[in-house]
Amino acid sequence: YSIDLNAPRLALGADGFVETLVRSGAHKYLEFKAIERTFVYADGVARAVASNRSDVFKDRGLSGGEKRALMRFLKAVHAEAMRDATGRRRSGKSGEETNVAVGAPGSEWGGDEFQTTKDDDDAEGLRVENGETMDAFLTRHGLSASLRAAVTYALALQTRADCAAATALEDLKVYILSVAKYGPQTGAC
């Protein structure tokens, strides 16, 4: 195998690549830096995107309704991501992305959000319709156009708004599990 070390690369903390580096011991010979901020460029302006709970509430560009809608959506995605990770750990597959206990220092989403029931409306709402685009999926969750762009491009790291919602949602789960995985810094590792 060959790894190109000539240029910085983006590797999310909950990604399998980082887990492989840590398990193999190769991480001792590499340097990692957490992403401090994520930006979306639109209308000639680069705008910082709230990527964790404290950023959402500090953002003066979001209305109260937008903050509630975004937090409700991100909590639901986090809860589902944690359920998925727990299922992988119990099945013997990789579950290392859950190494920060929910509610512990370094967990950005608190403790109660993970413990949802099957009747939880937010969890049910995360079902992706066959062929649904990410933009339609986020619209169904009540996110405004600016929030849809921020979630799609900055958090799910997609390049098009009409990307498949199922793929983008899986990428968003990895991003959310990466936030503060290795400490309370802002952003994904």
Report residues per predicted region:
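Rossmann-like flavin
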Residues: L5-A7, V18-G187
